[in-house]
Amino acid sequence: MASPALISETEAWKDLKAHLEGIKTTHLRELMGDTERCQSMMVEFDNIFLDYSRQQASPDTINKLYKLADAAHLKQKIDRMYNGDHINITENRSVLHVALRAPRNSAICSDGKNVVPDVWNVLDKIKDFSDRVRNGSWIGATGKELKDVIAVGIGGSFLGPLFVHTALQTDPEASKNARGRELRFLANVDPIDVARNISGLNPETTLVVVVSKTFTTAETMLNARTLREWISSALGPSAVAKHMVAVSTNLPLVEKFGIDPINTFAFWDWVGGRYSVCSAVGVLPLSLQYGFAVVEKFLQGAHSIDQHFSSAPFEKNIPVLLGLLSVWNVSFLGYPARAILPYSQALEKLAPHIQQVSMESNGKGVSIDGLPLPFESGEIDFGEPGTNGQHSFYQLIHQGRVIPCDFIGVVKSQQPVYLKGEVVNNHDELMSNFFAQPDALAYGKTPEQLKKENVSEHLIPHKTFTGNRPSLSILLPTLDAYRIGQLLAIYEHRVAVQGFVWGINSFDQWGVELGKSLATQVRKQLHASRVKGEPVEGFNFSTKTLLTRYLEATSDVPADPSTLLPNI
């Protein structure tokens, strides 16, 4: 008998639907009272501890989710990814970001070819180049050392490397290696982002890394041309070869731009942008800032989770458990969002990166076979470090909409602070909130409890917390390069699990194309109106009105302006 075309047509899905009502009427207060249940919902790997006992789920729920995973052929899909099969069928590509952090002696194939040697050729080239820049043997056009780096990219070429950079900045080993150096990321085509990036920097000591696979990405290439002008206007056109390098596959366009192809670092079609932080996209700028040895530890951490994900049984497999619970929360309990709440300021850019990884991967409305999905998939991801978020949006999480939460804590702070006479140290104060918030969400506070506390009758409705709000807790032992790599890979694979179970293609992103094509039409109109004075035509009334208003208000912009760079 053929497998159902949609996962929602399987008996496992229908069984979970039937199971749903019993769970909805069982409060987390009751579920948390079952010690045996709680113990069964705690998993540890390599000193990473996952506690998902505060999920709205019973052991029976979890077993039914395992059956759903089997019905979705989850294990086979994971194996196909690792085997280099073209699981991204709309672009006919392998999905092999795991190869980017594989040990040198590994064998991971795409189209019958082991890609690991190619990966390590690029890594070796990055190590050699970053070492030369850092030790001063590669210098700028005027003989000065290149201490400052601006990485130019957008989307996955920006958010992932920025997350890792921000997480490493306060790590003792990494911060020591980065002394006297500066790493910035230019992503937005907004000239304000250009101004902020070049502010305080000297072109003589600045190296620009342009990240674009095709070297045609509109925003990235406009920013790259802007920085090329910034360098050449200060140092002369010939300086570009010493002050700009590329991460790209399009060597002819790189050379035409003025960058020596020798100073180009490759990556491959089997690497999606949002999964590319472990390629030259992230490894090159991060190695320039922190040294290759630190970044290699990051890659090793990611690889450790790759191995865990591919080999651990589902009941002990952290990414699988997280992915299945997300499917349960989104498609069965009907919760459309997820809050990512790291209790570490070093992880302040985790949520924005995972927002892209998750929402670009799983924001799909059709199955991998092109069938409309009759259920909700994907979730809205957002977050902020604790305790900052507690003074921002936790009000809604506690007393408004139900939003499942990921609490991420770190046992040992990167930068401990102790003050004599304080009841607890700074990190203990932070972690007190990490441990308290999940219980507040799960248990809430009843009117009866408030009455016993002699709360005024008219305030009781306002101070009541319904509880029964699901969360999970991830406890990391430390936050060094290795652990940062592990955390990244956990979330990458979690997203893949969700997509595999929902039966969607998590590795394409056609949703970004329509807006880009319409922007091309607008761009042509702006040029025609500014240069030739042509009226706005070919748009709906709303867009025509807005465009006309914009053009009239910027009529002082010259049709053929001379170069003007930010002055800040």
From Swiss-Prot:
UniProt pathway: Carbohydrate degradation; glycolysis; D-glyceraldehyde 3-phosphate and glycerone phosphate from D-glucose: step 2/4
Gene Ontology CC annotations of this record: cytosol
EC number from the UniProt entry: 5.3.1.9
Single GO MF descriptor: carbohydrate derivative binding
Protein's UniProt keywords contain Cytoplasm: yes
Keyword tRNA processing attached: no
Protein localization: Cytoplasm
Assembly description: Homodimer.
Protein name stated in the entry: Glucose-6-phosphate isomerase, cytosolic 1
